[in-house]
Amino acid sequence: MVDAINPLGTDGFEFVEYTAADNTGIEQLKHLFSSLGFAEVAKHRSKEAWLYRQGDINFVVNAQPHSQAEEFAKVHGPSVCGMAFRVQDAASALKHALTNGAEEYKTEIGPMELSIPAVYGIGGSLLYFVDRYGKQSIYDVDFRFYDDAAQRLAKSDVGLYEIDHLTHNVKRGNMDTWAGFYERIGNFREIRYFDIEGKLTGLVSRAMTAPCGKIRIPINESSDDKSQIEEFIREYNGEGIQHIALTTDDIYQTVQTLRDRGMDFMPTPDTYYDKVDSRVEGHKEDVSRLRDLRILIDGAPLKDGILLQIFTQTVIGPVFFEIIQRKGNEGFGEGNFKALFESIEEDQIRRGVLNNA
């Protein structure tokens, strides 16, 4: 519903778009998504683009020559070049965004192709507005589905079913700029604020959410020039989407299946699990299973329930994925932020990026 509270009429994420600079990079993206349980179900009718799907999650791999995706890949390498919001009326959403300072992305539309309005978002990536979703979707027009798409979906699924949140890394001094961007165009509001200090570096983060409650975007900014946020920006050659969090209802089974398929996750020190019972009192999870699979748990505060989460290693340049299961907790793992931050920091020390002298 479009109103003063929800001026874009948002209703969740529709897709995330990925690209790479060459065929090898594109094939690596396809292999990665297959490993994550996504099925390639369709190809664009007129472009070099493919649709990967799992549950209600849509990933688009874009290798179209002479496109925004190609230009984006020249700068960033394998990367996230766009994301789409579900909205009630795409044309109305575009008009509202432009009125409030967004810059329109304009491109030529091919024959028999839908015009999907878009503006420039984080790091020059695109933010699309999509008002055809669900049973009548944009893919029905622009893509040709494979005859065995249903079988592919059933065979590949690991239990992931929606995008929980999508995190930005920005340059120092730009966190409020991008928070303001989402406030202006979509009346997003800050629901969490973090100030995390590791042993040697730190970050601050503002978690923004859309009025519909289905689009959550934490925005991270470094406190110094050596943190993992700054390293991301150097490697990515700019600001961008740091990670995509995907929801499951059975994180134990999902993670076990992903590990069996060869997915690598960020390491968590044993000492983390020694402190779980005291840090999250009354959680009722099997700590031995958490430890075996290296799943993180948080309940800050416990009265709001708990959440379980785990992070892959970086898999698209410096971009990674999060697997999350919420059991009443709508946070972002605040209690795990510091543990994870220090885990990445220890990896930076091992790689010589930080000097623990």
UniProtKB/Swiss-Prot annotation:
Q: Which residues cross the membrane?
A: none
Q: What is this protein called?
A: Hemolysin VllY
- Keywords from the named record: Cytolysis, Hemolysis, Iron, Metal-binding, Repeat, Toxin, Virulence
The UniProt entry's GO biological process terms, in alphabetical order, are:
symbiont-mediated cytolysis of host cell; tyrosine catabolic process
Q: Which residues form the VOC domain?
A: 12-132, 162-313
What domain of life does the UniProt record list for this protein's source? Bacteria
Q: Which CDD domains match?
A: HPPD_C_like (cd07250), HPPD_N_like (cd08342)
- Per its UniProt record, what InterPro entries does this chain match? 4OHPhenylPyrv_dOase, 4OHPhenylPyrv_dOase_C, 4OHPhenylPyrv_dOase_N, Glyas_Bleomycin-R_OHBP_Dase, Glyas_Fos-R_dOase_dom, VOC
Query: What Gene3D superfamilies does the annotation carry?
Result: 2,3-Dihydroxybiphenyl 1,2-Dioxygenase, domain 1 (3.10.180.10)
Q: What is the lineage of its organism?
A: Bacteria, Pseudomonadati, Pseudomonadota, Gammaproteobacteria, Vibrionales
As one GO molecular function, the record gives: metal ion binding
Describe cofactor binding as the record notes it.
Answer: Binds 1 Fe cation per subunit.
Keyword Chaperone in record: no
